[in-house]
């Protein structure tokens, strides 16, 4: 199973995904590169791809730094759970949902010259998003212990495992701490997705997709400061035993940096958003023109996004019954898996949605031709990536991640998971465009139905294969490491689902 690819990378999907402030010239570059004049599909997709590429590259640097300190093990599992636990907010209220329920309506209002109605609609959406997202975040903070227990029931008995020396840290207790920081961070990132929706509707693509760089940089700064404060020798930990208490403090510092990064990611977009809206009235009124229509579109999208979210949570739930490091291996592989989806799928899909929404319903042939051309563009770029990952994925993983506590065994297990994900890469990437094509036609039910079926099949296959592959280890397959302590490959079975 694989999580839904999202632009922001608190990943992630994405990955990401999701990521201090960018240089002051970024906003000016965005204004120059994405003028009010109608951008061509290719140039708009190029702007989106440029922003996503910058965010993903700095995200890879972030993951390499995290791998250096935590490797693939108990601490990295807690880090990944901290990002995934509040993903309900990100996936149900973030960019994917706003693409269906906000951008088409806002774009049509702007195209019809109803600038004041569009601004009032945007303000109402922001108000409603803020109320819902921060309410859920508050519940997440108050009931973090329940959230962790439900998502990772296999961690509840960690106190005994620490006593026996099986693992270095009580993952359950540490996860509760970081989840309480992760929920507010994700609520802020949801508001950042609203800003992205406004900018995309006005064809301002570059700034909105560069903004996650701020999140990633904030995490890197927090990691560096934390390492300086808590570790005796931050630059010489390869192969050495680092006190678990120090690594736990470092992990908490990382999530504090995530909150700061969320504020920065939203903040770099707000000045441009406010200039575009001109008349801006935040509210929580359902009587504002367009809001009820948006809510009607929102409900089936939430069902579809909820299905994807269930898939991601099933990965987390099932991985708790596998050996330590399974969740980290899945997440490290997903970072690479989501890169071509973001660059070649999401970039085209995001830039095409406002344009497809503007095409008259009477011009179906024009609509289909635009979708067909964009689909060909995506596959032309993705198919070579599939071949490259399968043939050279081990080298890619090694170059990007193998450092410090991240060793050769870790590289092999992440490569095997990446290869499993890669088998479905072309289909997943193309689905991003097709999903947005349905949204542009005001059809949010069809993608939701497809998502539910996809998740059901994925869960059944992944949970069965997980048990088969968990009997194998890296030592069994490639003879690397020690037979008694070699990393297991149960995560590969989950990825194949």
Where are these regions (language model features)?
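Membrane-embedded alpha-helical bundles of multi-pass transporters/translocases
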Residues: 2-497
